[in-house]
Amino acid sequence: MNKAVFGSFTILCLLSISSIPVLIHVVRADGGTVFIRADGSIDPQTAPIYTADNITYTLTGNITADDDGIVIERDNTVLNGAGYTVMGNGSGNGIDLINRNNVTIKNTNIENFDYGAYLENSSNKTTSGNNVANNSGGIRLDYSVNNSVSGNNITANYRHGIRLDYSINNSVGGNNLTANGGDGVYLYYSVNNSVSRNNVVNNGGGIGLDYSVNNSVSGNNLTANYGDGITLGSSSNNSVSGNNITANNAYGVHIDSSSNSSVSGNNIKANNWNGIRLDSSSNSSVSGNNITANNVYGVGLYSSSNSSISGNNIANNGYGVGLDFGSNDNNISANNITANNGHGVGLFSSSSNSIFHNNLVNNNVQVYSTSDSANIWDCDYPSGGNYWSDYNGMDLKTGPYQNKTGSDGIGDTPYIIDSSNKDNFPLMGTFSDFNAPSKYHVQTICNSTISDFQFNGTAISLNAAGKNGTTGFCRISLPAAPINGTFTVSVNGTDVPYTLLPESNNTQSYLYFTYHHSTQEATIPEFPSSIILPLFLTATLLTAMIYKKRPTRTT
């Protein structure tokens, strides 16, 4: 009889012990809200949070709350969720910080609140390594300064993934933002913030800025968002650089009613509307972007002015560059506008735009211009106009009137677009612009493909690839400041004659020379029909820096 009683008692004890973890993993007290008080205490004391030093607070179980989850009233603290979950019922904030400084929130799962984490008037706070999902909004900062939001997974929130309102000098970086109903990241009336290296996929929109100034959006991946990849609305002096912006359902980058925006070095591909769109915007720069396979325009301007579109690769889009509804006084230069399905450049009721040094190659229609559009298509002589792949003119003459014997890389007759538009000095080869030391530029017009440009301060070298057995030419424009003196042009180690155009002056030198593409010089096996010719352009420099002496002055 006693043995039977002992056995029953043992079983009951084991069952009781096994139930203890279940009791401490889910805690409700005072509506479920847990407070870290200003004096370092935890309220209620039964909450599954442990601290040994009143600095680092570590969850030891899950928390379920009817309103706010955890309210931190103490500065200089660390909340380590240790992988546990703070679960709400659709109201309140998962983690709530108001008027706090130097707080870290990490490794916490936060679900089913109004906001997963909410900061107001807070500074020097780090939010990292958290999973914030299925809330109305993910993480929100109001009137907050010098905070970092990094390395979080923010998914399936009804509104924005991360939102900053009236906030300054914050960093939002390295987060994974997916399937949020609003923008992955949204800034409103915010200044000097950095949004970088985030993966922003399948959200209502990618990254949005409204009424915001001096922010940087860089190095993000923005893919398959239902709206725009990046939107700047009524904002100024913002930078968008080095982002991968692909397959978004609207525009890749949309700049609306904004000024002094910079969009540079981005890969903008296969977006449903324009790659880049400027609406009612001014004084913006779009440069060095790779803009391909977008369904409508690569770059489209609508009622926008005084902006620069330069150095972009704009290829295989529905259309290349479009200016519409009074987009005047813009500069479109040094772009490769290639193989677009419609027109390469379209102008609709837009005038006084400068369009030169572009390579327009194999577009279905090179230019479409309405009768009320009159624009400038060249930069005078000898700088020249654009390269047109369908230009059939010759280059037997030189000079500003193309009436002197000799070649100069400029076509002898204009390229006619319509009665109001013509390129007076069409280029005979593609245009390239290379950076040289001290912010100088070296520009080439060449019927070969240029690569491996190098300038060491005393010599310029470049490779030119062309069809086997043909004659190549190159016209090089050099700044006189770093290179002045007597020139020597060498092709494959052999000096060749060149022409120094009479228009050369004390600021710019123009050299023209020819060469033959020869199979004996083939050095790249994957291009058997092409050759690579090293072209060395050397100048004897008469400067103290190089030779430690100056030429004798004549009196």
Predicted segments with their positions:
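Functionally critical loop-and-helix segments that line ligand-binding/catalytic clefts
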Residues: S19-T56, Y84-T85, N124-K125, G129, ...
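A cross-kingdom C-terminal cell-surface attachment/processing module
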Residues: S529-K549
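N-terminal extracellular ligand-recognition/capping segment immediately after the signal peptide
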Residues: D39-D43, D53-T77, G83-M87, D372, ...
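Solvent-exposed beta-hairpin/edge-strand motifs
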Residues: T77-N80, S477-D495
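Short, charged juxtamembrane terminal tails flanking transmembrane helices
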Residues: R550-T555
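Thr-biased low-complexity repeat/linker tracts and other Thr-enriched repetitive architectures
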Residues: N124, S128-S351
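Extracellular beta-strand-rich solenoid/capping regions of secreted or surface-exposed proteins
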Residues: T51, T64-L79, M87-T104, N112-S122
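Surface-exposed beta-strand/loop patches in extracellular or lumenal glycoproteins
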Residues: D67-E73, Y368-S369, A465-G485
